[in-house]
């Protein structure tokens, strides 16, 4: 699409576009802001639907050949001109989040999202173990660490790698100076996503919390779990003098203690090959095809597969409802762990709502105890 056409579409457009902008501004004035705070699953879901023609059906921009979207967002004009296609502004008000304690005594999961600059958004989940100290440390300091690095490093993959290593080093200093000896065995996963100009998505992770992009209704995995089951990870552990032992459930653990091979914290295992260097992935969003990004902790991942997550989210009216649906489904399937989800809507939100839900009703009923 030409620059002139983009500017015409955004600044003037037809009556339908102007009416949509008016409706959007009214909605944003009335809508309650979603902040990075856990909401109970009984809270009323918010729905961002539009019917400017009075038909009662969701409004779309199909007449302009752009995308089918049930969440109305303004266009980012400079990036749209730069990339030659409309790029919607992702508003934090529309990000959904939910966290459930499960059957644990304490919720050690943490999540966060923020606008770091005019161009960069930040989303993260942290799944603590050995207490919440490491997850709390990341929740408190990671955002500022990334902000401090942004003016110095333009490559977001390099930036996130530096941020993870700096946070791990800072937590190590904090733990060693603390009188609390339990901090030496406290650690956390970290899955962090940065979105620049509404189109460049970069994800970095250590541990087994995941990031999934829903493209054309199908999951695109942006992270790979760091476990001793991976040959490359296991080899590093052994080269560093560590070992892998299996518990009574047949699950491999580093030195018989930790189920992951990369983390922030876990200072007692640093000499055994447990590292804080993340694996990163960069992807260019296609807003006509990409519905959402979802970040999840292992309380969800080990019970609900990636396609099921996409299907459950696609059936929901808005991201906040979707985040609750995913965490509650994990509980129904029998998870005992904390479960957390952050759902970030993109241009094709709602486009694949009618996709087939591929999950087993017998599994659902059995897990919920209805057939016990």
UniProtKB/Swiss-Prot annotation:
Residues binding Mn(2+) 2, per UniProt: 127, 298, 337
Cofactor(s) essential for the protein: Mn(2+)
Class of the enzyme per the UniProt entry, highest EC level: hydrolase
Chief site of localization: mitochondrion
Region feature (Disordered): 34-55
Cellular compartment(s): Mitochondrion matrix
Similarity comment: family membership: Belongs to the PP2C family.
Name of protein: Protein phosphatase Mn(2+)-dependent 1K
Naturally occurring in which organism (per UniProt): Homo sapiens
């Amino acid at each position: 699409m030409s620059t002139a056409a983009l500017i015409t579409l955004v600044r003037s457009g037809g009556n339908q576009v102007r009416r949509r902008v008016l409706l959007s501004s009214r909605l944003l004035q009335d809508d309650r802001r979603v902040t990075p705070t856990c909401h109970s699953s009984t809270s009323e879901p918010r729905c961002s639907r539009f019917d400017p023609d009075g038909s009662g059906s969701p409004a779309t921009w199909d007449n302009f050949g752009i995308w089918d979207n049930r969440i109305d967002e303004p266009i980012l004009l400079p990036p749209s001109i730069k990339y030659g296609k409309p790029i919607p502004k992702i508003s934090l008000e529309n990000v959904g989040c939910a966290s459930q304690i499960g059957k644990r005594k304490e919720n050690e999961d943490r999540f966060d999202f923020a606008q770091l600059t005019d161009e960069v958004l930040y989303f993260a989940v942290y799944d603590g173990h050995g207490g919440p100290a490491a997850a709390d440390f990341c929740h408190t300091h990671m955002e500022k660490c990334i902000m401090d690095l942004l003016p110095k490093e333009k490559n977001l993959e390099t930036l996130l790698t530096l941020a993870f290593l700096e946070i791990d080093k800072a937590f190590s200093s904090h733990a060693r100076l603390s009188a609390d000896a339990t901090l030496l065995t406290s650690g956390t996963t970290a899955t962090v996503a940065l979105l620049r100009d509404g189109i460049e998505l970069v994800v970095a992770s250590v541990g087994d919390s995941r990031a999934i992009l829903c493209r054309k209704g199908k999951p695109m995995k942006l992270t790979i779990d760091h476990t001793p089951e991976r040959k490359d990870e296991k080899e590093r552990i052994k080269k560093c003098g560590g070992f892998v032992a299996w518990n009574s459930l047949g699950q491999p653990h580093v030195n018989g203690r930790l189920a992951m091979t990369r983390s922030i914290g876990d200072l007692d295992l640093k000499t055994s090959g447990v590292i804080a260097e993340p694996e990163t992935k960069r992807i260019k969003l296609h807003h006509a095809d990409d519905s959402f990004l979802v970040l999840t902790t292992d309380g969800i991942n080990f019970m609900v597969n990636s396609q099921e997550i996409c299907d459950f989210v696609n059936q929901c009216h808005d991201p906040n409802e979707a985040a609750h649906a995913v965490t509650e489904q994990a509980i129904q399937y029998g998870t005992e762990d904390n479960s957390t989800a952050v759902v970030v809507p993109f241009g094709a939100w709602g486009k694949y709502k009618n996709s087939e839900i591929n999950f087993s009703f017998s599994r659902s009923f059995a897990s919920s105890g209805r057939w016990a």
